[in-house]
Amino acid sequence: MNDFPWLTIIVVFPISAGSLMLFLPHRGNKVNKWYTICICILELLLTTYAFCYNFKMDDPLIQLSEDYKWIDFFDFYWRMGIDGLSIGTILLTGFITTLATLAAFPVTRDSRFFHFLMLAMYSGQIGSFSSRDLLLFFIMWELELIPVYLLLSMWGGKKRLYSATKFILYTAGSSIFLLIGVLGISLYGSNEPTLNLELLANKSYPVTLEILFYIGFLIAFAVKSPIIPLHTWLPDTHGEAHYSTCMLLAGILLKMGAYGLVRINMELLPHAHSMFSPWLLVVGTIQIIYAASTSPGQRNLKKRIAYSSVSHMGFIIIGISSITDPGLNGAILQIISHGFIGAALFFLAGTSYDRIRLVYLDEMGGMAISIPKIFTMFTILSMASLALPGMSGFIAEFIVFFGIITSQKYFLISKIFIIFVMAIGMILTPIYLLSMLRQMFYGYKLINIKNFSFFDSGPRELFLSISILLPIIGIGIYPDFVLSLASDKVESILSNYFYG
């Protein structure tokens, strides 16, 4: 066990520091904003320092582990630890949350509570990624939902209450299946509950019971990922939420579902995952085509980007269901890659809305001359989303392709068919992204607002855009940095399977 409680401090610090903000003056909007940014930067630096000096890349076992008895009556432990699977998502969470707080500068109504909720969400997300106890994972999973619901219901568009209610119904409803799975898997085979993930990974179950557990966890994670047909909350939520909240949703929240699929379904229930993986492969392939073909029909800019997220998550599902070293590594790389790209696109959509106050693409047009910096960044990041070589999306999708090709689980004819359908999805992606750029920035100037003058991207927006663009290009040029973090853990997970 680690001598110093690094992870406990990293998890508790944001929400504790955020609670102090509630005692700051009511009219101190700037104070609240800068205080929150300082907390996020300090948290990110603390996380980076702890990982740089304590994390060993060649060790697939749990590191920085902490194990404290929390509630004696329930025999409940506070177990924390990280490995190659969680370190990338934790660093991504810190980076995106810091930029999202900077993006939230225009928020003035109840800004103190808004920023507190962002910090509470930060703690819940890091807690989920670093939990080594199944019940603690569930508690952190639920803790993170409360601030998200409040952020969605209090700040956003006219239909924000509808979208927030839809979000909480989907996520809270699926959490019932998660809780049943947690209780079932921990109580099976012993009088005392076993909630330690390391012990549960070595446990075996009857086939029927393992399938039931797998389905319960799958429903919970499929809603968050999202996997079709449980995705319908996502476009509505993104369409109404404030763009800083959208950055957190696209950059981190969706990745929690994919993380859960690998951490619990794939690692704890390998036999059931082996049985369900062909179905997941089919669903992931359909998801790419469905979302890519639905996206061009969306008038709302943020809904179009939301459907692109659904399409890109399909590659993660395919990588996970390939049960190969390249496939799973590609899925993890896509989790990180899309975290940056999705957050960047929603930020740029939000900054565009701040200037023109329009969300419908058919009402826009000819903005390239008026806002050239935003146009340039939007174009570059759209290219990243359609997997342009040299960007992180390209290498992630290429590795997933390679994972399917090398998979020993599937017949050659089925692999050829899956790759063919995936290729069609990749062809459809430029269609909806390039048509989005054309409707926004090219053609005649359709915006007809009296006494309205555009102002281009300021230093804050430019700094944010470049900050997200740099890791996208960096990962695209040198993906080994991200792949090396998880490679040993991936091998450890796949050792439970008989092919790979």
Curated annotation (Swiss-Prot):
| UniProt catalytic activity | a plastoquinone + NADH + (n+1) H(+)(in) = a plastoquinol + NAD(+) + n H(+)(out); a plastoquinone + NADPH + (n+1) H(+)(in) = a plastoquinol + NADP(+) + n H(+)(out)
Q: Which InterPro entries match?
A: NADH_Q_OxRdtase_chain4, NADH_Q_OxRdtase_chainM/4, NADH_UbQ_OxRdtase, ND/Mrp_TM
- What's a single GO CC term here? chloroplast thylakoid membrane
Gene Ontology process terms (BP): aerobic respiration; ATP synthesis coupled electron transport; electron transport coupled proton transport
Which EC class is this protein assigned?
A: translocase
Q: Where in the cell is it found?
A: Plastid, Chloroplast thylakoid membrane
Location, primary (coarse class)? plastid
| Record carries keyword Aminoacyl-tRNA synthetase | no
Per UniProt, what is the membrane topology?
A: Multi-pass membrane protein
The UniProt GO MF terms for this protein read:
NADH dehydrogenase (ubiquinone) activity; ubiquinone binding
Q: HAMAP family, per this entry?
A: NDH1_NuoM
Q: What is this protein called?
A: NAD(P)H-quinone oxidoreductase chain 4, chloroplastic
- Organism expressing this protein natively: Arabidopsis thaliana
List the top taxonomic levels of the source.
Eukaryota, Viridiplantae, Streptophyta, Embryophyta, Tracheophyta
